[in-house]
Amino acid sequence: MKTYTNKFHDKHIYLYIENSEISTINDFDHLIDEYQKPLQVGVDSDNDELIELLVKNDFILKRKCYEVEVTKADLKYPLENADICQCHYGSSEYKKCCQILYDYYALVHYDISPLTASFDDFVSTLPKEAIYMREDGVITICAFVEENEIAYLATSKSDSKTRRVFLSALLTFLFDKYQYIFFEADDTDYFATELKDIFDINIRNSYDTYIKYYKKHETSIE
């Protein structure tokens, strides 16, 4: 079993566990006591042996991440076009999209593993192209794309109808260029989930996040 940290989510200690190690692991309390931080493990949803170990040791399932590969034929309904814009690294529009994503990413990750990276460090990892839509002249919704991958979606204050319009226009734009589109959708990310739900697909497996909390995190009821 290996431990490591993630500077983007530095409030947790991450564990990597091989299935061959499962029989040798008795408990995780010594790691909790040593690091005094929650322990986080990523595991394939069909890895029953490892999941059994985690649940037995008070790890909680906090997130399911679905990897999605789709074509236009998978759509539940026809797409409608709308006006969307492209921007690239270095432009003021790109920076605004980065800020929207930074805030949105922090929001949807807060209850799982809070974002601890600075804005500049976060932006340095992003694709250099973003697609966005304005409401009343203000950018409120965007996607970061890299070829046929939708890497990130974010919104600041748009409603569900506006998000549907944006997603429809985004998919129209991408399907005009590519046969296949890829993206990941966490079940804790409502915007990405809305994107996944546009398609008539059945994804059986997911990549799941389990967390064991440090005792100071817990609230006792007297």
Where are the model-predicted features located?
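A conserved beta-strand-loop-helix scaffold within acyl/acetyltransferase catalytic domains
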Residues: 1-12, 110-156
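A short, internal acetyl-CoA/4′-phosphopantetheine-binding micro-motif in the GNAT/acyltransferase core
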Residues: 11-25, 149-163
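Acyl-donor-binding surface of acyltransferase catalytic domains
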Residues: 20-83, 166-172, 180-218
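Short, well-ordered alpha-helical scaffold segments within catalytic/effector domains
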Residues: 25, 94-98, 116, 164-168
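Exposed alpha-helical structural elements
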Residues: 27, 49, 96, 114-121
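A broad structural signal for short, well-ordered beta-strand segments within beta-sheet-rich domains
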Residues: 38, 150-152, 178
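Short amphipathic alpha-helix that is part of the acyltransferase structural core
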Residues: 79-112, 221-222
